[in-house]
């Protein structure tokens, strides 16, 4: 394992488990606040397509640690999910970098404003959060390791925010894989038939 200490960029980089991992990379938003991201990429030089997620669950919280019951049920019912991966980097409802990085993708996992390692006030599904995801997409597109093609992939919360940010039409958003995500949270989530669901 090789680790480079945080330097001028303010984040640490290490080679681990066949990946180059950048921890707590700052991504500056249009209002000056810096969100934090973990970037998992193939080792060596080269440009790769990006799979990005941004959400409130904590980018560094392992699936099995934060959601043990759901994790155990998933790997019991579908053992192929855990095959070929240590599951150390698998987080709730996001892609597992140990499966995607060997296929030539960069996985960028961003903590939403006010969540995990990102400062600020958490305001779920707000216009501010949606703009933050837009800026994270555009940031990822221009990094030296990126082809400029950024896709979004995730379940539930990570799917719903895909629909919201897509409405802003980020120039470098080229793909979405939204699983189990309401496209209209008013009708599908909070007010079925116009009646508040509690």
Predicted features by range, described:
Residues 144-157:
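Alpha/beta-hydrolase fold nucleophile elbow
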Residues 23-24, 28, 36, 107-109, ...:
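Mature extracytoplasmic enzyme cores
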Residues 34, 47-49, 103-106, 146-149, ...:
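Loop/turn elements at helix/coil->beta-strand transitions in domains of secreted/extracellular proteins
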Residues 7-46, 50:
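N-terminal cap/lid segment of alpha/beta-hydrolase-fold proteins
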Residues 91-92, 102, 124-144:
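Alpha/beta-hydrolase active-site loop
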Residues 38-105, 110-113, 124, 167:
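N-terminal cap/lid subdomain of alpha/beta-hydrolase-fold enzymes
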Residues 73-76, 128, 153, 160-198:
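A catalytic-pocket lid/entrance helix-loop region that shapes and gates access to the active site
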């Amino acid at each position: 394992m090789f680790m480079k200490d945080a330097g001028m960029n303010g984040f640490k980089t290490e080679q681990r488990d066949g990946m180059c991992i950048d921890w707590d990379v700052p991504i500056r938003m249009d209002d000056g606040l810096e969100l934090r991201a973990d970037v998992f990429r193939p080792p060596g030089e080269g440009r790769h397509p990006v799979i990005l997620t941004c959400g409130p669950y904590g980018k560094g919280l392992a699936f099995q640690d934060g959601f043990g019951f759901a994790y155990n049920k998933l790997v019991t019912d579908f053992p192929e999910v855990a095959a070929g991966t240590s599951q150390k980097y698998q987080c709730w409802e996001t892609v597992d970098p140990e499966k995607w990085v060997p296929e030539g993708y960069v996985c960028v996992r961003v903590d939403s404003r006010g969540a995990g390692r990102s400062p600020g006030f958490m305001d779920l599904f707000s216009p501010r959060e949606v703009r933050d995801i837009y800026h994270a997409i555009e940031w990822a597109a221009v990094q030296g390791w990126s082809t400029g093609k950024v896709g979004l992939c995730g379940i539930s919360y990570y799917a719903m925010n895909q629909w919201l940010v897509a409405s802003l039409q980020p120039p470098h958003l080229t793909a979405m894989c939204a699983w189990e995500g309401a496209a209209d949270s008013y009708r599908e989530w909070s007010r079925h038939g116009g009646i508040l669901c509690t």
